[in-house]
Amino acid sequence: MEGPEVTDGDNVLNLTHLGLENLNLELVSENKRKDVQQILLPHNRLVVLPPLVASFIHLHLLDISNNNMVYIGEEILGLTKLKTLLAKNNRLDEFSFPKEMGGMRLEVLNLSGNRFEEIPDQFLQIPTLKSLSLGGNRLKSIPAEIENLISLEFLYLGGNFISSIPSELANLPYLSYLVLCDNRIQSIPPQLAQVHSLRSLSLHNNLLTYLPREILSLVHLHELSLRGNPLVVRFVRDLTYTPPTLLELAGRTIKSHGIPYCPWELPENLLRYLDLASKCPNPKCSGVYFDCCVRQIKFVDFCGKYRLPLMHYLCSPECSSPCGSTSHSESDSEDEVNVAARRMQKVLLG
């Protein structure tokens, strides 16, 4: 039997579409192993990698997609120069990898089309990771520890069973592309608006009924995909309004009327509470609110073509217009509409 094909100046070991069930790397000479930078193994029948793969000390890319892989052992840890690991469409799950991967220098990890029910902790130990793809798995949640991937730019989690988005995603300073389509997400955390590097946000085919108004502050967002969501208007008067507490009423009175006070004149809990005031977004209202507020859906134009329902928080039911959830209301801010149209250059709704 002839040895595996080594091409492109002895840098690429190409073994695609050969129906291999076992990988005999002993046929590759020791000198050649040191030169190989890419190993391509897609469309075979491999179940595991042989330990000898660790001898490819200059390997940058390993593609084992479209096999029957169930396990990737600790030999992967010996590939200290590995930047890209592609293992799409296998039978891998959260128990298929070494428990400690923090020493790896991976930048691209694609494990879409496998059997993951949760994102393994060891993936969240790789600070160099720039691209993580786990689409088409069985994920039910995104762990808060996702914030540990401080270099992450691309996150693909489409086609899972995710129902919520953790606010910790806002702590990823370089995140530019976030794909969460085809899940079961019902709401977007307002903190997501802090990801100012975000350029593309795919949320189509979820269970969204509104968007938080904070999304307007995503100044670099060029693509927003929302097709296939209910986006059902929920009228504010259909919601139960809980009366403010005495503490909130006191805070509102002081803030709204600008009543002067000295620190020793007020209880300590009220002093701390006053710092938590939020201004009512109704331009005709000068009031504030703390814990008690009324939710209102307001439509905002994007690109002069689409109208998106954004969630507003008002200080009381009196601040909501009877027409607040129709095409225009008296409390609509033309500035917000113009800014939104300018910032959202491409809204994918169809």
Curated annotation (Swiss-Prot):
SMART domains per the UniProt record, alphabetical: LRR_TYP
Family matches, as PROSITE patterns: LRR
Matches recorded under Pfam families: LRR_8 (PF13855)
LRR repeats: 14-34, 35-56, 58-80, 81-102, 105-125, 128-149, 151-173, 174-195, 197-218, 220-240
Span of the signal peptide: none
An example Gene Ontology CC term for this record: cytoplasm
Keywords of this entry: Leucine-rich repeat, Repeat
InterPro entries found in the cross-reference section: Leu-rich_rpt, Leu-rich_rpt_typical-subtyp, LRR_dom_sf, LRR_domain-containing
Keyword Acyltransferase: no
SUPFAM superfamilies associated with the record: L domain-like
Annotated protein name in UniProt: Leucine-rich repeat-containing protein 58
Source species: Xenopus laevis
